[in-house]
């Protein structure tokens, strides 16, 4: 019985220690990618895309997110939110449009217009 308990504790310790090592490697991997990016312009922190300006940074999941610009003086220049879920094809076309989607302010929808109203 004691041998089983020792083996169980050893296995649990190895599992948790392995998880910590894996997390540390992932953090180092992100840091390495930032340091090794070779970006001479602006490096987006969320996506590690090299762009001309912070205004050009994409959302991490552009197919399902809207990039809402925030007013000057905010902690961040923009916030990425989930596109509103709707079965209305006309609304989906608006939200999928890279120009119209972020400008949309449709009553009753949690879009960029809603973000602006609730700051």
Curated annotation (Swiss-Prot):
The keyword ATP-binding does not apply. Keywords: Signal. Residues 1-14 form the signal peptide. One of its GO terms (biological process) is ERAD pathway. The keyword Signal applies. Probable component of the endoplasmic reticulum-associated degradation (ERAD) pathway. Belongs to the LCL2 family. PANTHER family: LONG CHRONOLOGICAL LIFESPAN PROTEIN 2 (PTHR38425:SF1). This is Long chronological lifespan protein 2. It comes from Candida glabrata (strain ATCC 2001 / BCRC 20586 / JCM 3761 / NBRC 0622 / NRRL Y-65 / CBS 138) (Yeast). The gene is LCL2.
């Amino acid at each position: 019985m004691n041998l089983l308990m020792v083996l169980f504790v050893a296995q649990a310790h190895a599992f948790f220690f392995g998880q910590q090592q894996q997390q540390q490697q992932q953090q180092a991997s992100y840091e390495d990618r930032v340091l090794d990016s070779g970006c001479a312009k602006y490096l987006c922190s969320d996506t590690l895309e090299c762009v001309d300006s912070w205004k050009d940074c994409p959302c991490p999941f552009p197919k399902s997110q809207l990039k809402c610009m925030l007013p000057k003086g905010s902690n961040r220049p923009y916030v990425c939110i989930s596109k509103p879920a709707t079965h209305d094809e006309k609304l989906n076309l608006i939200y999928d449009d890279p120009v119209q989607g972020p400008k949309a302010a449709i009553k009753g929808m949690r879009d960029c217009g809603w973000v602006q109203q609730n700051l």
